[in-house]
Amino acid sequence: MERAIAAEPNVAVKLCIAEGTIRINGSERKEVRVFVRNGRKFEFRSLEKNPETGKATWLWIASTSGPGPLSNCLAGDSVDIDLPVGASIDLEARTAGAVIDSVKKANVKIVEGSISLRNISGGIQANAYQGDVMVEGSGGPIELGTTTGNILAYDVKPGNVGDLFKAATRSGQIALEGVVHRQILASSISGSVAFNGKFLNGGIYNFKTTNGSIRMLIPDDSACKLIAAYGFGSFDSVIPLKIETENVTGGGKNFVGLLGKQTNGPLATVTLTTSSGSIGIRKQSEDK
């Protein structure tokens, strides 16, 4: 089944999907087009319209399958949706993987399945409870979460000063490359955390894992205030470190120091914490 409706370029679209893979793409057309393969019938419900044009500014895509559990949710072998590039999407799904490309903003929650987001310029909230979360070429405030999956972010930037990048997983790994937010919070309980990028002046960076390792791959001339705590693990840095304060107990070790050489402008503050894993800091030039 395929249907389309005229919409404003900045239309907000919400829907839920009970079953089926999901692909959402931005387009230059001022319409919302939906194709459900071998699935439930559906309809467009305009929750709000532009009074001048009559086009939808807030749209709910809902199933017309009748009463029952998840009765308002679309379902099928696959669901393909085309939206204006300035649109925002609010998606909840159960057993499905989602690929979202080239829309303004995305809010996604999936129970079983992975989430892939590309070219989302206005911010992301994505939670895959039993799947991976991957973000590429996107911007704005970003919050990513998963329970059992991994998180990968590549080429990501803030939209405004103060935008936060946050990633959290319980048993998966976190890998960040080219993430240029000045505020980054990344945490895992039993997985590793890896960062390949630059610490910007005045930035606040917090990387934490309980049972995994922390790996930083940064430019050779990096400088920051470093706060590190490691219980039964180890610490190693190839970049010179001047320790200012240090505390050693039976439960571990923590210190505050200057990594690299003092530069003009406020230094970034970097906090690295692990209970039983290792912390390693390497130069990007050594990885080439």
Listing of model-derived features with the role each one plays in the protein:
Residues 1-288:
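Intrinsically disordered, low-complexity terminal regions
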